[in-house]
């Protein structure tokens, strides 16, 4: 599975763990082995620029999903193929959220990456039922990689 981690933040992040998490999401949701995504890690200033440009919202955010192809989870018999798109992470915002949530910044980054990838696959949390489905799946996927319960999400929708 083609997952590229691009750290443009100048801040050390757990690239191996991010790669492992992304591949796990692909595998569990039956995304084709030739599907592609990029995970870009940026500083707060760059994230604020992207947030304004793509969402027309001020200030940095924790994670942004920038979809390319419209992919949905596949099945073992028919995995989804294509370019998922990009997930952009901000370790500075992740660190603030992790501190509020009482867990590590690295765990928060895994949670945010999973959240962003689920958005790329068409999951959302606007409606209560969607939120329950997405956050339950997010929790399960992160827990499977961590080998322990995932931290509770610390973001506000």
UniProtKB/Swiss-Prot annotation:
Its EC number is 3.1.-.-. Signal peptide: none annotated. Zn(2+) binds at residues 115, 119, 125. GO terms for biological process: rRNA processing. SUPFAM superfamilies: Metalloproteases ('zincins'), catalytic domain. Pfam families: YbeY. InterPro entries: MetalPrtase_cat_dom_sf_prd, YbeY, YbeY_CS. Its main location: cytoplasm. GO terms for molecular function: metalloendopeptidase activity; RNA endonuclease activity; zinc ion binding. Its cofactor is Zn(2+). Single strand-specific metallo-endoribonuclease involved in late-stage 70S ribosome quality control and in maturation of the 3' terminus of the 16S rRNA. HAMAP family: Endoribonucl_YbeY. This is Endoribonuclease YbeY. The gene is ybeY.
């Amino acid at each position: 599975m083609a997952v590229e981690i691009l750290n443009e933040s100048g801040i050390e992040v757990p690239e191996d763990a991010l790669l492992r998490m992304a591949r796990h999401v692909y595998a569990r949701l039956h995304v084709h082995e030739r599907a592609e995504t990029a995970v870009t890690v940026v500083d707060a200033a760059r994230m604020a620029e992207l947030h304004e440009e793509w969402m027309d919202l001020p200030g940095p955010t924790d994670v942004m999903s920038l979809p390319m192809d419209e992919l949905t989870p596949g099945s073992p018999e028919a995995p989804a193929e294509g370019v998922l798109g990009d997930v952009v992470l901000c370790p500075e915002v992740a660190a603030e959220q992790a501190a509020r949530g009482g867990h590590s910044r690295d765990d928060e980054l895994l949670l945010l990456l999973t959240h962003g990838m689920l958005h790329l696959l068409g999951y959302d949390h606007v409606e209560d039922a969607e939120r329950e489905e997405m956050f339950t799946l997010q929790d399960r996927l992160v827990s499977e990689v961590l080998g322990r319960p995932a931290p509770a999400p610390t973001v506000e929708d």
